[in-house]
Regions:
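Extracellular/periplasmic periplasmic-binding protein-like sensory domains
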Residues: 30, 34, 137-218, 301-302, ...
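Extracellular/periplasmic Venus flytrap/periplasmic-binding protein
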Residues: 22-23, 31-143, 148, 179, ...
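Extracellular/periplasmic catalytic domains that process cell-envelope and extracellular macromolecules
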Residues: 7-10, 27-28, 60-62, 114-116, ...
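Short, cationic low-complexity segments
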Residues: 299-328
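Sec-exported extracytoplasmic/periplasmic mature domains
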Residues: 4-12, 52-56, 84-92, 114-118, ...
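Venus flytrap/periplasmic-binding-protein-like
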Residues: 14-16, 20-25, 102, 144-163, ...
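Catalytic-loop motifs flanking and including active-site residues across diverse enzymes
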Residues: 43, 47, 79, 184, ...
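Segments of small-molecule ligand-sensing domains
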Residues: 199-211, 222-297, 325-326
Length: 331
């Protein structure tokens, strides 16, 4: 959020791997910003789709109550534009409850939740301390963890372990699934860590959520760089910021390419274009069983991806108008 407006001036790609300002996915207004793979508005739409499936359909969501419990920051409020619109369309009562940073004091918020008696809680926390504190507080007020859905940045093993038994049953979404049996992960484990060249003090973290997410991001950067070198006749040579951006917009991570790299299934297939910098727009739902995350859905997209895209374009257009930005022509 703090540096997004500097990218064009500095000619530097801002790779928001599933985080940051959502309307950065409109490459016409934000040509240097990439949300790939998938942004927060698609994420909240996938979560609400999952809730509807659990409740028996969208028609059963009318009259339901969802609390959006979040850290009081731009990040915590990021999903609200899409969430408010979906809630209004479905007849859902949305209750917004904020937590002052750093988020370790949550008792009053959970007492409010006990009073509200919501059907679901979406949790947008920051840091394992805040994230685990929410689960222990939920347990104290007897709010079921299988009615809580965590943001991607609260969806790691490090967020669950500190809460102990209180974490069991919690749902979370992923843009990169954990596991060390993906061929690339297994190869790194064998060839890098097996030869003593790894930099993790605890090698058991290889294949965890955050580690695999970092691997997914690294793969994307390397593929974008290779694209840039090939497109501009610079194979084996350094590229400029603008050329690297071109490489990003040429990303086409098909199932076949992901399999060739060795991460098929770990991330959703996606492609990028001049106008669309989001990528897959898909997330997988996981549930913590007390020891590990168990995948409970495949790669899910919002019920209406075009609706989410329209929200993105409208928000980006508003920003462009307010800041005298002429959107890039993508042909």
């Amino acid at each position: 959020y703090a540096v997004i407006n500097r990218m064009a001036e500095d000619n530097v790609v801002l790779a928001q791997y599933g985080y940051g300002r959502t309307d950065g996915a409109d490459g016409r207004v934000w040509p240097w910003v990439f949300n790939a793979a998938s942004h927060y508005w698609s994420q909240i739409a996938v979560k609400m789709k999952f809730m509807a499936e659990k409740e028996g359909g969208i028609d059963k969501m009318k009259g339901k109550k969802i609390v959006h419990l979040h850290i009081d920051s731009a990040y915590g409020r990021e999903p609200l534009p899409a969430m408010r619109k979906i809630a209004s369309d479905w007849g859902v009562k949305l209750v917004e409850i904020s937590i002052p940073p750093p988020g370790l004091e949550q008792q009053s918020q959970w007492l409010q939740i006990r009073k509200e008696r919501p059907d679901w809680v979406t949790f947008w926390g920051a840091g394992s301390g805040m994230n685990s504190t929410a689960m222990t507080n939920a347990a104290r007020v007897a709010f079921p963890r299988d009615r809580m859905m965590y943001v991607t940045f609260g969806a790691a093993e490090e967020d669950m372990y500190p809460a102990g038994d209180a974490a069991k049953g919690t749902y979370a979404v992923a843009n990169a699934l954990p596991g060390d049996d993906y061929p690339l992960v297994a190869a790194i484990k064998e060839q890098v860590y097996g030869s003593g060249k790894g930099n993790l003090a605890d090698e058991s973290r290889v294949g965890t959520v955050y580690w695999n997410r970092g691997l997914g991001a690294a793969v994307m950067w390397i593929e974008a760089l290779k694209n840039a070198q090939e497109m501009h006749g610079k194979v084996g040579k350094a590229v400029t910021g603008a050329e690297f951006r071109d490489g990003y917009e040429a990303l086409n991570m098909t199932e076949d390419r992901l399999e060739e790299i060795g991460i098929k299934g770990m991330v959703a297939p996606f492609s990028i274009s001049c106008a669309n910098h989001e990528g897959a727009g898909k997330f997988a739902v996981m549930q913590w069983d007390g020891d590990k995350f168990v995948q409970v859905t495949g790669w899910e997209e919002p019920l209406d991806p075009a609706f989410i895209r329209k929200l993105v374009e409208d928000s980006a257009a508003k920003f462009a108008k307010e800041n005298n930005i002429t959107p890039k022509s993508c042909g």
